[in-house]
Amino acid sequence: MLYLASRSLCRRQLLQRLDIPFQVIDLEIPEVRREDELPQDYVRRVAQEKAQVGLARVRDAFAPKVLGADTEVVLDGRVFGKPADLVEAAAMLAALSGRTHQVMTAVSLVAAGGVAAQVLVVSEVSFALLSQGQIARYVDSGEPMGKAGAYAIQGRGECFVSRLVGSYSGVMGLPLQQTAQLLTTFEES
């Protein structure tokens, strides 16, 4: 049985597109970047921790496989996680305005017996120049809260994106092509 270790409704909806039965494990993992930890190492570690903690919760299930994922926005080496408040959300959007940033999503798959696999997908996202009014209206909508980098590409935040190179679903939180390939490879090994 496949389990998704995530509180993200968006990840649940994305995984449903693969037509694979799964159950959700609702868990909270502290997402704190270690000093001197590279952004890509950070997202890989958090995704792996989510999967491992999820596996510990379903250890007694028959042949459990647990999928964990983490997504972060990175600009000039600085990691933009989920904003703590509206002020931080506005500051993140102002920093991203008119710039190109990376969206890193790591997906980890673990199973009983220590079997594990992982993929990291990095997408490049360019934002148009945003006015203070645009930022204020978007922040007031509430959409930036709970989103890495303070925007949802699948929502109103899409109108800020002038260019995307990479995985649209990866920017949303679960790169579907790579996740499908990971699951297929995992089953074959």
UniProtKB/Swiss-Prot annotation:
Gene3D superfamilies: 3.90.950.10. It is an enzyme of class 3 (hydrolase). Its cofactor is a divalent metal cation. Its EC number is 3.6.1.9. This is Nucleoside triphosphate pyrophosphatase. It is found in: Cytoplasm. GO terms for biological process: nucleotide metabolic process. Its main location: cytoplasm. Belongs to the Maf family. It comes from the Bacteria. GO terms for cellular component: cytoplasm. The keyword Cytoplasm applies.
